[in-house]
């Protein structure tokens, strides 16, 4: 009987603890030494993006017809973004002053800057064009400290950086099965990433795109805590107590 109790305690201990391999990130990180860093990431413009386009020149009067009215920084709420910027319509175009409809979907920011610069040089020889995405955001759900929607100001964010913004995974987050949900070319794509391995750094999903969704599913321990499946360690603990009582009574 005592052997049964000891075995139950051993199993209880094993099932109650997360293993080191389940918790530590990038466990084969030594393989990253001297590896080439991916080229600078630049997001591709999509329908429903809102672009901030700034046109400047030595002569302010020349660029005035091409610039929208500037809003105060404290008025830059989500409701005012469309007023401050140019909404990319379902056809992938923006309606730009004087120039009319400009096709921007499928282009990078630098490509749009070059396109507008070429067109505007007919009016302004020293024109400078700057394009930014106003509504670049990612959504982080599941087993993280602070789930929510995060606006990315510099339009460049990696999976580890985004999870850092959300306060990192909880202890109950499954680190080897992170879901990235992305809409691309009218289709929804879902991929899985393993944070315990360093090959995440070479994944096409390492850099997040606007409107990406990260979902961190609960680990087995997290599912047990939710009550959807029996808590085996708790059951074993109960059995151990009962067996211990039986031993004491039958002595």
Q: Model-derived features: where do they sit?
A:
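Sec-dependent bacterial lipoprotein signal peptides
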Residues: 1-17
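Ser/Thr/Pro/Gly-biased, low-complexity, turn-/loop-rich segments
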Residues: 2, 17-251
């Amino acid at each position: 009987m005592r052997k049964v109790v000891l075995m139950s305690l051993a199993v209880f201990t094993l099932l109650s603890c997360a293993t080191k391999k389940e918790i530590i990130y990038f466990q084969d990180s030594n393989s990253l030494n001297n590896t080439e860093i991916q080229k600078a990431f630049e997001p591709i413009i999509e329908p429903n993006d809102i672009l901030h386009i700034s046109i400047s020149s030595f002569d302010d009067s020349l660029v005035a017809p091409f610039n929208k009215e500037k809003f105060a920084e404290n008025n830059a709420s989500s409701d005012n973004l469309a007023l401050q910027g140019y909404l990319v319509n379902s056809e992938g175009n923006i309606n730009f002053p004087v120039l009319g409809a400009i096709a921007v979907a499928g282009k990078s920011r630098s490509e749009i800057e070059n396109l507008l610069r070429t067109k505007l040089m007919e009016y302004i020889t020293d024109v400078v064009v700057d394009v930014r995405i106003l509504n670049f955001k990612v959504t982080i759900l599941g087993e993280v400290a602070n789930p929510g929607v995060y606006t990315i100001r510099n339009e460049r964010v990696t999976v580890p950086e985004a999870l850092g913004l959300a306060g990192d995974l909880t202890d109950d987050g499954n680190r080897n099965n992170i879901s990235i949900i992305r809409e691309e070319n009218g289709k929804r794509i879902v991929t899985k990433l393993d944070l315990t391995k360093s090959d995440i750094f070479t994944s096409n999903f390492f850099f997040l795109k606007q409107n990406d969704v990260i979902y961190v599913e609960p680990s087995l321990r997290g599912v047990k805590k939710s009550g959807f499946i029996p808590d085996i360690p708790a059951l074993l603990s109960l059995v151990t107590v009962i067996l211990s009582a039986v031993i004491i009574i039958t002595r």
